[in-house]
């Protein structure tokens, strides 16, 4: 088998032990009608290659244009499960829009929503990137939603 330091409990660090770095999570102010969106993969997906429309991890079948929401957030916003909504992201350089996402009830943290990528990629601001890696901040996008037109 290939060498695997952690599996063999070998840590190539100055201390000879596993070392962890802790990064504080920035506080993001959300307006009353805003949520923090993270994009995720489905079970039938490898990176951006999509093999099917089913996500057995989350019990979602036959659809990928979904916004997964906390049940209490759905009720508080006056939405219903299965309702079709348009999503808008908000960043310093303007707004981006992605139409016709289906609300799906999931056990996610309050004021946070999950969407699949690449379907929600248009909402991710190209200029919003991680400081060191320069990768898009796809796990931290401020959005709002309204009933679909």
Task: Name the predicted role of every residue range.
Residues 48, 53-149:
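Long, contiguous, secondary-structure-rich segments that constitute the structural scaffold
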Residues 1-56:
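Long, low-complexity segments enriched in small/aliphatic residues
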């Amino acid at each position: 088998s290939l060498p695997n330091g952690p599996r063999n409990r070998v840590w190539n660090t100055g201390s000879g032990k596993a070392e962890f770095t802790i990064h504080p999570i920035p506080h993001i102010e959300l307006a009353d009608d805003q949520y923090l969106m993270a994009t995720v993969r489905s079970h039938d997906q490898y990176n951006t290659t999509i093999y099917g429309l089913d996500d057995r991890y989350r019990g979602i079948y036959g659809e990928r244009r979904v916004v997964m929401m906390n049940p209490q957030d759905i009720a508080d916003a006056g939405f219903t499960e299965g309702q079709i909504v348009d999503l808008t992201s908000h960043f310093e350089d303007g707004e981006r829009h992605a139409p016709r996402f289906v609300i799906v009830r999931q056990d996610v943290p309050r004021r946070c929503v999950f969407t699949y990528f690449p379907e929600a990629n248009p909402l991710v601001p190209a200029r919003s990137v991680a400081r060191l890696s320069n990768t898009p901040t796809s796990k931290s996008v401020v959005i709002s939603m309204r009933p679909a037109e």
